[in-house]
Every structure is written in structure tokens, then in C-alpha cells.
């Protein structure tokens, strides 16, 4: 838009970092609350006139204000020298001050909730080193439901805002280090990415598909092997 203003924000946060030892288990817990007030939030609208090639043109403009607030929890525990566990969880709300239409073709579909902002997401990492040079790790990423815009095309006849499913992606990696010469080390590794096969099931197909209708983990279940040289 011709009169586009910069997006501004005011943010506040408070946190507590706690440490405690339960027997031989060393633990750490971080608790953080956050609040952000956004002004002149950027949004997109479709112009009536296409460009010279006939493509639809979307214009960035200043919408209403918005607020983002939530709670972040992160914990770490070292059970032994060979086993550590770390995990985090974020609970948040992201809303515009007033409901806005996410697509000009369906002005009746108005939402206060921001697109592609799940209310809940988190992660975990578990690392095992039972013997020297060998490491096994299991990691996971959780993404809660969120709103995603699905434009008209091969998938749907008219634009619709879709509530995506929850995803829990779990990965596993095994690695072993071989000393080749003095400080030169060769690592051989392999594993499985996205063991749970948490993956989008409703991709659009065809020439008129909505290429932006993509969400969730980037890859389905897959296997990998690799080598790395450290010195």
C-alpha cells in the first residue's frame, strides 16, 4: 500500500531460572512468561487488477493491532554422565484486536486468531552415551493445531481456513567415532527421521494447486546414513 507504515511492537517478559539436585540427578527448570503488543500489523489483500502477465497481485497493508502472550517452560535433567534429557513446551495465544478476513474471496471468513500460529508446541532431546565414542539420541518436535489458509484450486472450490491436525515427529540417530590419526576423527552415523511418519496427508495436486498449502514436518519417515570428519 502507498501509505504502508512500519510494524512496531512493545514486548515484556519475566522469567525464573531454577536449579536443584535430586540425589545424583542435576536438574534445571526455566519458566518464562511473555507478552507482545503489535501495532500496524502487516497483512495481505488481493487487488482487483492483475499484473501484466495476468497473475493475481497481493498487496501488503497495515491491519489492526495484535497481541501475542504465553508461557514457555524448559527443563533439563542429567541423570548420569551418559544420559541427559531436555524438553520444552510453549503455550501461547496470538490474536488480532479485531477479526479480519484472511482471503478477499471469502470476506465472511473472519478470524481473530493469526494464521500458522499453534497454541501449543514443544520439543524433547534424549542423549545416551553408554560407552565412549558411541552416542544414541532421540529427539522429538510437537506442533499443535493451527489455522492454515487453503486457496481455491485443485484441492477446494473456494478458499477455506483449515484447522490442521497435531503432529508429533520423533527422530533417532546413532553415531560412533573412530580415531584415524591423533586428532583426526571419523564419525559414522545413521538413523530414522520422523519415525512416527507424522506428515501432511492432503497436499494439492495438479497445475492449479495451491503451492502455499503446506504445513507440518518437512519430510515423511526416512532413513539416513552419513560420515563426518572432525579434526
Predicted regions and their residues:
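Extracellular loop and loop/strand-boundary signature of outer-membrane beta-barrel proteins
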Residues: 1-3, 56-62, 106-113, 156-162, ...
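Extracellular/periplasmic, surface-exposed regions of secreted and cell-surface proteins
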Residues: 3-4, 42-44, 73, 93, ...
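Membrane-embedded beta-barrel scaffold of Gram-negative outer-membrane proteins
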Residues: 5-61, 67
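Residues that define the transmembrane beta-barrel architecture of outer-membrane proteins
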Residues: 8-12, 65-69, 116-122, 166-170, ...
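Residues on the lipid-exposed face of transmembrane beta-strands in outer-membrane beta-barrel proteins
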Residues: 14-18, 71-77, 87, 124-128, ...
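Short loop/turn motifs that connect adjacent beta-strands in outer-membrane beta-barrel proteins
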Residues: 21-27, 82, 133, 179-186
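Gram-negative outer-membrane beta-barrel transporters
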Residues: 28, 32-37, 55, 59-152
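C-terminal beta-signal and adjacent terminal beta-strands/loops
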Residues: 37-40, 85, 141-151, 176-231
Amino acid at each position: 500500500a502507498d501509505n504502508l507504515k512500519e510494524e512496531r511492537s512493545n514486548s515484556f517478559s519475566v522469567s525464573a531460572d531454577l536449579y536443584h539436585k535430586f540425589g545424583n540427578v542435576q536438574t534445571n527448570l526455566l519458566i518464562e512468561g511473555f507478552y507482545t503488543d503489535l501495532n500496524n500489523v502487516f497483512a495481505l489483500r488481493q487487488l482487483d487488477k492483475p499484473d501484466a502477465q495476468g497473475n493475481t497481485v497481493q498487496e501488503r497493508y497495515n491491519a489492526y493491532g495484535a497481541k501475542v502472550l504465553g508461557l514457555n517452560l524448559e527443563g533439563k535433567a542429567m541423570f548420569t554422565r551418559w544420559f541427559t534429557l531436555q524438553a520444552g513446551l510453549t503455550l501461547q495465544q496470538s490474536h488480532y484486536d479485531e477479526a479480519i478476513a484472511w482471503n478477499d474471496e471469502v470476506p465472511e471468513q473472519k478470524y481473530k486468531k493469526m494464521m500458522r500460529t499453534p497454541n501449543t508446541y514443544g520439543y524433547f532431546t534424549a542423549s545416551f552415551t553408554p560407552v565412549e565414542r558411541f552416542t544414541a539420541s532421540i529427539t522429538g518436535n510437537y506442533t499443535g493445531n493451527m489455522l492454515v489458509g487453503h486457496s481455491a484450486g485443485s484441492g477446494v472450490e473456494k478458499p477455506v481456513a483449515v484447522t490442521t491436525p497435531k503432529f508429533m515427529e520423533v527422530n533417532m540417530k546413532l553415531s560412533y567415532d573412530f580415531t584415524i590419526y591423533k586428532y583426526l576423527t571419523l564419525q559414522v552415523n545413521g538413523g530414522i527421521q520422523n519415525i512416527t511418519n507424522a506428515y501432511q496427508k492432503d497436499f494439492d495436486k495438479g497445475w492449479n494447486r495451491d503451492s502455499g498449502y503446506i504445513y507440518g514436518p518437512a519430510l515423511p519417515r526416512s532413513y539416513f546414513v552419513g560420515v563426518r570428519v572432525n579434526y
